[in-house]
A protein has these predicted regions:
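Conserved glycine-rich cofactor-binding loop
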Residues: 10-11
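Catalytic Tyr-X3-Lys loop
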Residues: 87, 94-114, 133, 157
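Conserved mid-core segment of classical short-chain dehydrogenase/reductases
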Residues: 87-102, 121, 146-149, 187-192
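Active-site loop immediately N-terminal to the catalytic Tyr-X3-Lys motif
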Residues: 94, 142-148, 206, 224
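Active-site helix of classical SDR
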Residues: 116, 153, 161
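Alpha-helical segment proximal to the catalytic Tyr-Lys
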Residues: 121, 125, 162, 166-170, ...
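Residue(s) in the substrate-gating loop at a strand-loop-helix junction
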Residues: 137
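C-terminal substrate-recognition "lid" of short-chain dehydrogenase/reductases
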Residues: 207-236
Length: 241
């Protein structure tokens, strides 16, 4: 049985990724700022293999102590880390407010960089050829009004992921990004039907991206079947063009 660390596990994509991993017989250490009914139900279904910890990733100073020392434990090997947690700041650049921008960068960029640092240290300590998967966004590659600031955080993580793959490939450690299209999640709930229709009409499939498709891709990248895949951006976006 392998152990995987997932952030943003409470609902939506994070919960679906956790479910995929648990159904494969592995264990999940899940981090979330809140605990949803969806996550509670998952914990009831997998009481021995799903461990949950409430933690606000904007508190970057506490990650080592609260996540890696107290929650996982330094003696516990982890075999993969999924950076799924993110917050959105939807607005045009001329309306930028620094406190909101800084908080988004803390959660979307600085926290996963620090989490990656300690995940790699855990891999090396336990002689694990670990896999890191960052959830990115199609907004990095195809412009959307109001997403310039959010997209910049995901673009930063794509660059980080590719360079981590280069730095640590010699240890058998892999790093990839899954570029997800627009999904029906709480993050997109504020969009009007008209806005959603415009977005989905830009895709080849004329439909939202399936949570299951993204989660299944993440599970594959974490598996040994993907042992030769690293430094890549894998698009799961309903064919956005």
């Amino acid at each position: 049985m392998r152990n995987f660390l997932i952030t943003g596990i409470s609902r939506g994509l994070g919960c679906e990724i956790a479910r995929e991993i648990l159904l494969n017989g592995d264990a999940v250490y899940g981090i979330s700022r809140t605990l949803s009914d969806e996550a509670k139900e998952l914990a009831r279904d997998f009481p021995e293999r799903l461990k949950l910890r409430l933690y606000d990733l904007s508190d970057t100073d506490g990650i080592l102590k609260c996540v890696f020392k107290e929650f996982i434990g330094l003696k516990t090997p982890i075999h993969g880390y999924v950076n799924n947690a993110a917050i959105a700041y939807d607005d045009i650049a001329t309306n930028m407010q620094m406190p909101r921008l800084e908080n988004m960068y803390k959660v979307n960029v600085f926290a996963p960089m620090i989490m990656t640092k300690y995940a790699i240290r855990n891999f090396i300590l336990h002689h694990v050829k670990g896999s890191i998967v960052h959830i990115s966004s199609i907004s990095v590659h195809t412009g959307y009004k109001g997403l310039s600031m959010y997209a910049s955080t995901k673009g930063a993580m794509e660059a980080f992921s590719k360079n981590i793959a280069r730095e640590w490939g010699g240890k058998g450690i892999r790093s990839n990004a899954v570029v997800a299209g627009f999904m029906e999640t709480s993050m997109s709930a504020s969009l009007t039907p008209e806005q959603k229709s415009k977005i989905f009409n830009r895709t080849s499939l004329k439909s939202p991206t399936s949570l299951k498709s993204v989660a299944g891709t993440v599970a594959f990248l974490l598996s040994e079947s993907a042992e030769s895949i690293t430094g890549q951006n894998i698009f799961v976006d309903s064919g956005t063009i």
